[in-house]
């Protein structure tokens, strides 16, 4: 149930034995698993010839259930670190992905720890949506026997900071569960907070269950070992063509230095959008990925932006500063280590205090206006509008660490081999007549030369996977750059010779300017690989048409596909498109399935739990 699979060579079981064991215990509750561990321990330690004497059975060890609700991998990595801490403290722990958690068993939990990230406008991570819905439904049980702790991960640049963590924390308490620790709300730079919290959790749980923490041996429940399968691959692992798992040396903190091989604009010259097709050569690195995964891209800020900021603050750039204990010139820190293109309300608040600018100070009292200002005004433009004389250390203290951007992978390695493709919408806008661009998208489109080095890593996404059965129909809904993973899906389905039907819904402003990968889709249709394609061009007529309108228009046939077992995939904008699409799906289910709104919502939740409704939204 964890996403951390140990090397097969370390296990005393063959893969076949491990698979049989997992099949046998797959439906066991944490309490049953704990009892089983004691049962096996007794079998191993029974002395030959000893006569069993009647005795009162020792109470089963209390298992800590650790739920990871991750969107971009941070919550998962933190949960894995905490699991390792708890095991080192000789506590019984069961780490489970929120999407795999059988939440109807939650009333049986005694010790529950949740690590939850937030996406979009306060939404839970995609894998945690079903659990979130259940807890906020009438079916949620009382949890008076449960003690819990919550760590929330978020981003202060968003209005609903750490909202998912807040939701889980408040709802668990409302259902009668007792807090082990106060909830933590962590920003992008969460590592120090997380380390302190992990130590507190271990100490608190050791005090709660002292008998286990002093046990002479460490037992690891079988549910913590998952055989390598397509849906349970650890973040640093990949599946080879032979089905075995290899551990990659590359990660977010240790990226691969690859080379840019292709950078091509795929929108027309008159398009309002600038979309680039990017191909990156992985060389002989052995870096592996699957359709549905994301590519993490580290980037440098625009040198011109760095120079502009230094000039505004009357700084030279050679001032010594420290970043994570590493000494370097200020200019280098601004170029490669600090975020310059994304502002936050917290940064505005701090800068207002330092600059004593009356306009900014007044803005702090108007929360909606403050949020809008932070969203639309990069740091350098805030400094231009409200000049100050920050020194180098004050500047570094204000800015957040630079973080990589994630892009849905637009290729299948079964076809492209040692390449990875992404589809990048370049962010461009003007502030006071000055052209600005996104940090990573501007780097990829404007500054990175072909054959230039680029640091990348794979962010595995086991919540966005093609069905295991190649005969299963697939419905893909991806307007704009949301089409990227479906290009990977179609490449994979074609290479596999999958016989299942494929249906694509795609939309963009104009047919002539914005039909991304048009020739490829036309070929798939001509060769029968793509069964159906429905296109929505929002600006080609007076009345705007979006993919959700096409879904509603095809409601009867959509329901037929769902009844045939189709898997539904949605990729793209989380705040508007994904919500509108979900509402249409609910309407289609209600109308053609003869259900009321509550039944339709439950039906869609069941599809989500069965991995038949998956979303990659941002």
From Swiss-Prot:
Q: Which cofactor does it need?
A: FAD; FMN
**Where along the chain is FAD bound?**
341, 375, 405-408, 423-425, 429, 438-441, 618
GO MF annotation, one: flavin adenine dinucleotide binding
Which residues does UniProt assign to the signal peptide? Answer: none
Q: Taking every annotated instance into account, which residue ranges of this chain make up the domain FAD-binding FR-type?
A: 253-467
InterPro entries xref list: CysJ, CysJ-like_FAD-binding, CysJ_Proteobact, FAD-bd_FR_type, Flavdoxin-like, Flavodoxin/NO_synth, Flavoprot_Pyr_Nucl_cyt_Rdtase, Flavoprotein-like_sf
Q: Which residues bind FMN?
A: 70-75, 117-120, 153-162
Gene Ontology cellular component terms for the protein in this record: cytosol
Tell me the ranges covered by the Flavodoxin-like domain, including all copies: 64-202
State how the cofactor is bound.
Answer: Binds 1 FAD per subunit.
Known catalytic reactions: hydrogen sulfide + 3 NADP(+) + 3 H2O = sulfite + 3 NADPH + 4 H(+)
Q: Which Pfam families match?
A: FAD_binding_1, Flavodoxin_1, NAD_binding_1
Give coiled-coil spans as residue ranges: none
| Record-listed E.C. numbers | 1.8.1.2
Instruction: Report if keyword Amino-acid biosynthesis is assigned.
Output: yes
Pathway per its UniProt entry is: Sulfur metabolism; hydrogen sulfide biosynthesis; hydrogen sulfide from sulfite (NADPH route): step 1/1
- PANTHER family in UniProt: NADPH OXIDOREDUCTASE A (PTHR19384:SF128), NITRIC OXIDE SYNTHASE-RELATED (PTHR19384)
Tell me the HAMAP family matching this sequence.
Answer: CysJ
Q: Which NCBIfam families match?
A: cysJ, PRK10953.1
Q: What is this protein called?
A: Sulfite reductase [NADPH] flavoprotein alpha-component
UniProt organism field: Yersinia pseudotuberculosis serotype I (strain IP32953)
Instruction: List the lineage, top down.
Output: Bacteria, Pseudomonadati, Pseudomonadota, Gammaproteobacteria, Enterobacterales
What gene name is listed for this protein?
Answer: cysJ
């Amino acid at each position: 149930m964890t996403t951390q699979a140990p090397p097969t060579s370390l296990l005393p079981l063959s893969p076949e034995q491990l698979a049989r064991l997992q099949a046998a215990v797959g439906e066991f509750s944490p309490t049953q698993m704990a009892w089983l561990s004691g049962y096996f321990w007794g079998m191993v330690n029974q002395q030959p010839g000893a006569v069993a004497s009647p005795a009162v059975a020792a109470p089963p060890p209390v298992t800590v259930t650790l739920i990871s609700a991750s969107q971009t991998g941070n919550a998962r990595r933190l949960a894995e670190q905490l699991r390792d801490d708890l095991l080192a403290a000789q506590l019984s722990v069961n780490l489970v992905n929120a999407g795999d958690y059988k939440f109807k068993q939650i009333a049986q939990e005694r010790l529950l720890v949740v690590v939850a990230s937030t996406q979009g406008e306060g939404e839970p991570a995609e894998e945690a949506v079903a659990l979130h819905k259940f807890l906020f439904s009438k079916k949620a049980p009382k949890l008076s026997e449960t003690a819990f702790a919550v760590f929330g991960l978020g981003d202060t640049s968003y209005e609903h900071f750490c909202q998912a963590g807040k939701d889980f924390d408040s709802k668990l308490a409302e259902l009668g569960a007792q807090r082990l620790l106060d909830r933590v709300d962590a920003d992008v730079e969460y590592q120090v907070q997380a380390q302190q919290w992990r130590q507190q959790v271990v100490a608190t749980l050791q005090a709660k269950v002292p008998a286990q923490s002093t046990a002479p041996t460490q037992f690891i429940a079988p549910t913590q070992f998952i055989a390598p399968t397509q849906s349970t691959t650890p973040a640093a692992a990949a599946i080879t063509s032979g089905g075995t798992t290899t551990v990659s040396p590359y990660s977010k903190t240790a990226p691969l230095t690859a080379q840019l091989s292709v950078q091509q604009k795929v929108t027309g010259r008159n398009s309002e959008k600038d979309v680039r097709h990017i191909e990156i050569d992985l060389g002989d690195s052995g870096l592996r990925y699957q359709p549905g995964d994301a590519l993490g891209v580290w980037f440098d800020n625009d040198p011109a932006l760095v120079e502009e900021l230094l000039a505004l603050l009357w700084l030279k750039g050679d001032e010594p500063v420290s970043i994570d204990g590493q000494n370097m010139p200020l200019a280098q820190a601004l170029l490669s280590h600090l975020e310059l293109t994304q502002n936050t309300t917290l940064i505005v608040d701090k800068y207002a205090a330092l600059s004593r600018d009356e306009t900014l100070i007044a803005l702090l009292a108007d929360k909606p206006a403050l949020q809008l200002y932070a969203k639309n005004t990069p740091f350098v433009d805030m400094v231009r509008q409200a000049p100050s004389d920050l020194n180098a250390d004050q500047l570094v203290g204000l800015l957040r660490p630079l973080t990589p951007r994630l892009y849905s992978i637009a290729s299948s390695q079964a076809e492209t081999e040692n390449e990875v493709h992404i589809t990048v919408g370049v962010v461009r806008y003007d502030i006071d007549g000055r052209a600005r661009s996104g940090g990573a998208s501007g780097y990829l489109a404007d500054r990175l030369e072909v054959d230039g080095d680029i640091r990348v890593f794979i962010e595995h996404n086991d919540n966005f996977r093609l069905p295991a059965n190649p005969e299963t129909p697939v419905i893909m809904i991806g307007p704009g750059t949301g089409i990227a993973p479906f290009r990977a899906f179609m490449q994979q389905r074609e290479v596999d010779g999958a016989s299942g039907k494929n249906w694509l819904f795609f939309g963009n402003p104009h047919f002539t300017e914005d039909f991304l990968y048009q020739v490829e889709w036309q070929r798939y249709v001509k060769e029968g690989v793509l069964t159906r394609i429905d296109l929505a061009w929002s600006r080609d007529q007076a009345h705007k048409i979006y993919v959700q309108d096409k879904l509603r228009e095809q409601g009867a046939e959509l329901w037929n596909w769902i009844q045939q077992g189709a898997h539904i995939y949605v990729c793209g904008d989380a705040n508007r498109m994904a919500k509108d699409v979900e509402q249409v799906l609910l309407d289609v289910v209600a109308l053609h399935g003869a259900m009321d709104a509550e039944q339709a919502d439950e039906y869609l939740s069941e599809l989500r739990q069965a991995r038949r409704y998956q979303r990659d939204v941002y």
